[in-house]
Design a protein with these regions (language model features):
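Beta-lactam-recognizing serine transpeptidase/beta-lactamase-like catalytic domain environment
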Residues: 1-215, 260-262
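Short amphipathic alpha-helical face segments that pack within enzyme cores
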Residues: 99-105, 225-232
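Short, gly/Ser/Thr-rich active-site loops of penicillin-recognizing serine hydrolases
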Residues: 132-140, 231-262
Length: 262
């Protein structure tokens, strides 16, 4: 089961996560039989309920901080945890709606295995002479305690495999530099008449995270483009590529992007 989850996470297998959303809606999770007879002759119905599945998805979304704004010191749109159709919601559709900063806080919690922080735009305030007036120490909002060690391992290994296998051509230079990046691509559908938003979230180093990020290209068609930006950010952050080579004043020619890619 561990390898199955890892593989599906790496390859963005919607069918697998549709099944997860469906099973969460069963009154006996993991048993897909609709009816069974008990020893006393009474029938127990194991039926699917979207409301039941949604309640479970909402529980974990709340734990990961997706029910609140991120804590930044600027106005921020309120998030929306999906309240419709657990099957679609399990792959991020439904009525899910989050700002990029809210996704950044979420992926930070994934990176550190469950500590949810309130974000801040500030590190510290100093006087003209350099004396610290106020230190913005990260504030812990809550901790996710009901995720198993094996689940964290599967998620982390799946995200690492995205960078080293699934989308390795994007991260060739970063991978060869010895910097271990973990990430996940995705597309967010706004409507049938708008191109999808391209997204990429990630953290590094994979085994001892120090930085986490979320990138969204509004109506950017493909997550490939967001992954390209993420790669450039990490190459700059870790000084893999000089700034003047990354900032060219023109858009990169990305030949691998496709409309609606995950």
């Amino acid at each position: 089961e561990f390898r199955r989850v890892l593989f599906r996470s790496q390859h963005s297998c919607n069918d697998f996560f549709y099944e997860v959303g469906y099973r969460l809606g069963l009154n006996n999770v993991g048993d897909s039989k609709l009816d069974s007879d008990t020893s006393d002759g009474k029938s127990t119905q194991n039926y699917y309920s979207s409301e039941r599945g949604i309640a479970k998805l909402q529980k974990y979304a709340e734990e990961f901080g997706l029910g609140d704004t991120s804590g930044m010191e600027i106005p921020e749109s309120a998030p929306q945890i999906s309240d419709d159709n657990s099957v679609l919601s399990a792959i991020g559709q439904g009525t899910n709606n989050y700002t990029t900063s809210q996704l950044a806080r979420y992926i930070t919690a994934v990176a550190n295995e469950g500590t949810v922080y309130n974000l801040s735009l500030l590190d510290k305030v100093t006087s003209p002479k350099g004396k610290t007036i106020k230190d913005y120490t990260p504030e812990v909002k809550n901790k996710v305690t009901d995720v198993s060690a094996s689940t964290w391992q599967a998620v982390h290994e799946g995200m690492r495999a995205v960078v080293t296998s699934e989308d390795k051509d994007i991260f060739t230079k970063l991978n060869s530099s010895g910097i271990a990046l973990s990430g996940k691509t995705g597309t967010a559908q706004q409507s049938q008449t708008h191109p999808d938003h391209g997204l990429f979230v990630g953290f590094a180093p994979s085994d001892s995270p120090q930085i986490a990020f979320a990138i969204r290209i509004a109506n950017g068609y493909s997550s490939t483009f967001a992954a390209e930006v993420g790669n450039d950010v990490m190459e700059y952050y870790y000084k893999v590529t000089p700034e003047n080579e990354l900032i060219t004043g023109s858009a990169s020619d990305i030949g691998t992007g496709s409309n609606g890619g995950d």
